[in-house]
């Protein structure tokens, strides 16, 4: 394993996966450090993407080239439009996803991204030189 990377992303959660993917697609040699490669972008006990708040974030990330929305589309079990009894401004799409497939799709996506390397380990400390770099 080489230790020459432009960017190190610690944590393979949703944000870490998106950050590592974006950095690598922009041409930076990127290492994603995760504690468990089988649980990349692991979903909670309620494996939903969407809703009023998270749905807005997912749409913004998608507009910038993110991967969560595409992976959600591939792993959706059920789709609902929330708040239909309220005005159209409150409507919000939500997708229930297959937890295992969601993580597996993220892993496949990351493993096939040029300039992106994944390492399973734990970060114990961060070391800086005297210039703070």
Predicted regions and their residues:
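Short, hydrophobic/aromatic-rich segments at coil-to-beta transitions
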Residues: 132-133
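Conserved N-terminal/central alpha/beta ligand/cofactor-binding core
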Residues: 21-129
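Beta1/beta-strand and adjacent pyrophosphate-binding region of the FAD-binding site
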Residues: 2-15
């Amino acid at each position: 394993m080489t230790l020459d990377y432009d960017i190190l992303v610690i944590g393979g959660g949703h944000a870490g996966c998106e950050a590592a993917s974006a950095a690598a697609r922009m041409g930076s040699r990127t290492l994603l450090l995760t504690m468990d490669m089988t649980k990349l972008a692991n979903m909670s006990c309620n494996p939903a993407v969407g809703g009023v708040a998270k749905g807005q974030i997912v749409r913004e990330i998608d507009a910038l080239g993110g991967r969560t929305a595409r992976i959600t589309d591939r792993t959706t079990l059920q789709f609902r439009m929330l708040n239909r009894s309220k005005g159209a401004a409150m409507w919000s799409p939500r997708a229930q996803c297959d937890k295992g497939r969601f993580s597996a799709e993220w892993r496949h996506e990351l493993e096939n991204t040029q300039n992106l390397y994944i390492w399973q380990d734990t970060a114990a400390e961060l070391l800086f030189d005297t210039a703070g770099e």
